């Protein structure tokens, strides 16, 4: 892309605006190199990156760029062995923190389901160096000072320094407090000169003080003297400071060597963060100018919806629809000067450059932009009627260069084509130049104020006339582009509104040819028709958007209602499960009481059995149905005791015990017995053989209540198998469909013994080892008949 074209379209000013949104000097540096690309794949990727960054800004506000500084100089110095300063290590630590924060921030958003694959891909390249960050932070604080605990040696030296400084100050302050010394001192303070502690002594008392003069006041009236009594103490202090400096140098050298080991990773982190800053700056700019992602193509088709020039004040800029490259490849905008033609031309050119640079463009959603190999522009300040030959020549030199390079993958912009010479010759040249460029199938937008070009679009296939609307009422252009309507001067209307007498205007019109007047009338009619059509289209579009908004609101309400319904069902099911669990616990407690009574050889009394039965029946909760029960799938039939049924209100299987009269049955569900209405029962299968004694045994005979698991670990072989026999019988009586036997892995002897017993047991339907989550081969899961 030619630099003079970028300058003519003021692309550098757009770059300056984008640079203002960068978070670091690194991002600004990268944006300074921003330029249009001719690779559609690269452009689409950059636009998608900006789109993802815009989503992040919309959802989270900003990405964390704090700590991102340019440390490349420090890293290069570390590579060659130069010792880095504490402040440089503070910057490196800040960068390491920024890397950690950015990686976590973007990774968390991706894990939360935000669709940012390209940004996430950048973040995955970041390398967190926690060890290096910890080493630096343990030695240097946020202000670039080496900490006392950076080493034990440094801690000891600084303790010594503080002690020595305290002694020197105490000695000097005692001198200052001396009554004999007060008249000889300019001030009663201890100060420092040449890194040594001194006191201010008046010039006339110099001989009364032994010691070393380190400085004199500007007036010469005060001498800053180090008394002889503290010279040795100051010397000791200086020696300690030298040791401190040497130890700090050693610590910094060690840190530099550690940093040098990771310069490759740090350079990569810098590059990734620089790229992210580059992307997010473009996204922040897009938000500031209300830009959208254009749809890119390589077919030369442009359709900009409500396009706005990004450098004009938002409250003054006029949005325009611009379409080029499908039904016509050339647009010629005609009309008078100062009508806004150049702004329209620059808007098209600048938005094309922005899109090809991976920037979102100030236009409405759904706008399309094309990728061009070349963008040519001949734009100058041609707003004066008087044009010099030199101006015409310079434009013609530029046009000749364009004609030599233009091809079908070019966008060509001509501003006031043919201006600067005789109007008739200029118009003829303009048409000839347009014909030549049009034959290459390039995309062309040209502006001119020559009336001869009004008919150009009607006589050429693939060429469309256009103009910029002029408001007769306000005597000013509206800057609204009218494609399909050629421009007209409006000179008569303007003159009339400004007070020119009617007879002069009438005489002027008579001087015009009938053909010219007819053309002007036709153009005026076209303008009115187009305006009405646009108003109707705008109204239709408004109705469509309102309908879409209503549709989305209804969809959202449906989603919310479904979500609320699902939540209510889930809560109801959870409450039901909790009630069943509580009922099971109550039943277990009751059976445990009966078992205890039996083991203590107590005889059952009638009232104890009656109370236990009532408690068992009352243990089953009365559910508040949060949803309608299932309807029976089969036709109504005659139930009989022993039938296996499904209790629809609870979704559980059970066995019919006896009919209690009317339409109710006593149903056994596991260890629970309850009354259920016949309409809430669904037949599954008939009873194989009635076992009348089963319920009696369950309460009065066999002690059948057991846990769902039998733990045999630590048991002797024979005792363990005996327990398995008893446990299986009890589990069958308890109505359990499935139990687990924990035998452990060990030598495998107990496991094999259990497996052999289960194969031949009358109540075992099947058995298997537990899954990974059930205990693996250390557990056998038994299905009971």
Swiss-Prot record:
The keyword Nucleotide-binding applies. CDD domains: ABC_MutS2, ATP-synt_Fo_b. Its main location: cytoplasm. Disruption phenotype: Not essential, it can be deleted. No change in spontaneous mutation rate; does not genetically interact with mutS or mutL. About 10-fold increased sensitivity to mitomycin C (MMC). Decreased transformation efficiency of both chromosomal (5-fold decrease) and plasmid DNA; a double mutS2-recU deletion strain has a 57-fold decrease in chromosomal DNA transformation efficicency. Hypersensitive to antibiotics that target the ribosome; erythromycin, chloramphencicol and tetracycline, but not to beta-lactam antibiotics. GO terms for molecular function: ATP binding; ATP hydrolysis activity; ATP-dependent DNA damage sensor activity; double-stranded DNA binding; mismatched DNA binding; ribosomal large subunit binding; rRNA binding. The keyword Lipid metabolism does not apply. Belongs to the DNA mismatch repair MutS family. MutS2 subfamily. This is Putative endonuclease MutS2. It comes from Bacillus subtilis (strain 168). The lineage of its organism: Bacteria, Bacillati, Bacillota, Bacilli, Bacillales. The gene is mutSB.
